[in-house]
């Protein structure tokens, strides 16, 4: 059993078995598609890598925005605490002055 093919995948089969001929034709179809399959596979890999990179960057950007918002909120809370502490201290001083004046 001997097979040979040219660049255009013409088949010359030196056997009478039709199953072997069909198998060889299927093999030729697969091997002729190899460059296209590999290009398509490479395209899908690049596409997947690009999508993953954009997704990771978006997640990183959202994380940084949350951190910035969190820092801004902490600053506001600290400012509010300082104001309320300042108000409490002022009220304590006023009550001390009133008590001192009342005595």
From Swiss-Prot:
Keywords: Host membrane, Membrane, Transmembrane, Transmembrane helix. It comes from the Viruses. The chain crosses the membrane at residues 35-57. It is found in: Host membrane. It is a single-pass membrane protein. GO terms for cellular component: host cell membrane; membrane. This is Uncharacterized protein ORF103. It comes from Acidianus bottle-shaped virus (isolate Italy/Pozzuoli).
């Amino acid at each position: 059993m001997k097979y040979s093919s040219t660049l255009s995948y013409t088949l010359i089969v030196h056997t009478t078995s039709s199953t072997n001929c069909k198998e060889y034709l299927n093999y030729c179809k697969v091997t002729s598609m190899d460059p296209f399959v590999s290009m398509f596979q490479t395209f899908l890999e690049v596409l997947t890598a690009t999508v993953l990179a954009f997704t990771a960057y978006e997640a990183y950007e959202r994380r940084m925005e949350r951190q910035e918002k969190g820092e801004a909120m902490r600053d506001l809370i600290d400012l509010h605490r300082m104001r309320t502490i300042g108000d409490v201290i002022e009220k304590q001083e006023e009550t001390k002055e009133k008590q001192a004046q009342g005595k």
